[in-house]
UniProtKB/Swiss-Prot annotation:
InterPro entries: aa-tRNA-synth_II/BPL/LPL (IPR045864), BPL_LPL_catalytic (IPR004143), Octanoyltrans_LipM/LipL (IPR050664). It comes from Cupriavidus necator (strain ATCC 17699 / DSM 428 / KCTC 22496 / NCIMB 10442 / H16 / Stanier 337) (Ralstonia eutropha). This is Uncharacterized protein H16_B0148. Residues 30-236 form the BPL/LPL catalytic domain. GO terms for biological process: protein modification process. Pfam families: LplA-B_cat.
Length: 253
């Protein structure tokens, strides 16, 4: 069964929580649907709920919101993620017949394959690996460049929920999974890292990110000597490539 693309109801609306549409995808997966969504968020930051342990979090959130950069809380783990112009999100929601411990790697690898194939069709070769110094670093980053000097181009995350009783299997192991990736298309690494570092400093987390550890699709294309369209055209080109790749890559069972 191919993925069904769902429009994001509030994508790009200033002040709206971009994660609400994403969580709604799990409700569709609970109906047995296999759904996908491409979306852009307004200028903002997204942090996991584990950041609630920082005493200065709510004060920093209020300060950043006043500056036009709201900070949203998400259900999945990991670290801080910048959002805004030039950044494209891909969310996939579907059912899995086994628990997270058995299939989380497969879910990550599927997401990396979808994005990697899309980027390869545009002339950008990537692979998955950790990139120390990048925001929200993880084992299943999608990275560009040789392994010893790789730069993060996309980050991935996932959130699991047990399937409702109406669609549960006899062994009780059916789950709903929301797999999410954030892809830097034309966003400037210096600008997004400065914003991320300012927030980490405001909550005194001790974290600091290196702009040289991330790269955009635009930068990767230019580095390979390819002509690059304007930002809007490049975003459309990347979106089309992702749609094709999602349609050609079935998820893990």
């Amino acid at each position: 069964m191919p993925f069904e693309f769902i429009d994001a109801a509030h994508a790009g609306q200033a002040g709206s929580d971009p994660l609400q549409d994403e969580l709604a995808l799990l409700d569709l997966a609970a109906q047995g649907r296999q759904v996908a969504q491409l979306w852009e968020a307004p200028l903002s930051l997204v942090v996991p709920r584990t950041y609630l342990r920082h005493a200065a979090l709510e004060t920093a959130r209020a300060d950043f919101a006043q500056q036009g950069c709201p900070v949203f809380l998400r259900m999945s783990g990991g670290g801080l993620v910048p959002q805004g112009p030039g950044i494209l999100n891909l969310s996939l929601a579907y059912t899995v017949e086994q628990p997270p411990g058995a299939r989380s790697d497969a879910v990550y690898l599927h997401l990396c394959e979808v994005i990697g194939d899309a980027l390869q069709s545009l002339g950008v070769d990537t692979h998955w690996q950790a990139v120390a110094g990048s925001f929200c670093d993880g084992r299943y980053n999608l990275a560009w460049g040789p392994p010893e000097a790789a730069r993060k181009i996309a980050g991935t995350a996932q959130y699991w929920r047990r399937a409702p009783a109406a669609m549960q299997t006899a062994d009780g192991q059916r789950h709903l999974v929301l797999a999410h990736a954030v892809l830097l298309v034309s966003a400037g690494p210096v600008q997004i890292n400065a914003r991320a570092n300012a927030f980490e400093a405001a909550i005194d987390s001790g974290r600091h990110y290196d702009a040289g550890k991330v790269v955009s699709v635009r930068e990767a294309l230019l580095a390979s000597g390819r002509a690059v369209d304007d930002d809007a055209a490049l975003m459309a080109q990347v979106s089309d490539a992702l749609r094709r790749s999602v349609g050609q890559t079935p998820p893990p069972a």
